[in-house]
Swiss-Prot record:
Chain residue ranges for the region called Disordered: 84-110
Keywords (A to Z) from UniProt: Mitochondrion, Ribonucleoprotein, Ribosomal protein
Species name: Saccharomyces cerevisiae (strain ATCC 204508 / S288c)
Biased composition (Basic residues): 84-95
Protein's name according to its UniProt entry: Small ribosomal subunit protein mS33
Amino acid sequence: MNVPKARLLKVAELSAKIFDQNFNPSGIRTGSKILNERLKGPSVASYYGNPDILKFRHLKTLYPDIEFVDLEEQYRLSMVEAKKRRGKGAPKKMKKDAAATAKGKGKKKK
């Protein structure tokens, strides 16, 4: 029971119309897969939060005469201090002369 290729293509085309799919018999890259996906714009925009909400640093710039207390910043600084006391803090920066000799750019030996 051989069915002509033209009839199979017609059936595939009708099936694509019924199920709202793209009919691409030649297999050309059309980008329809990407165009049919949901748009990512709203989810990306909502990831960064509402830009209209005032943040703490904005309050400090709007009202410089009022001394606000940033609890999150105080907590961060206390944790940094605790790490330093335990020897887990950031290393001290090298001085300019020490950095030059460490890289071999100091005085040259004859």
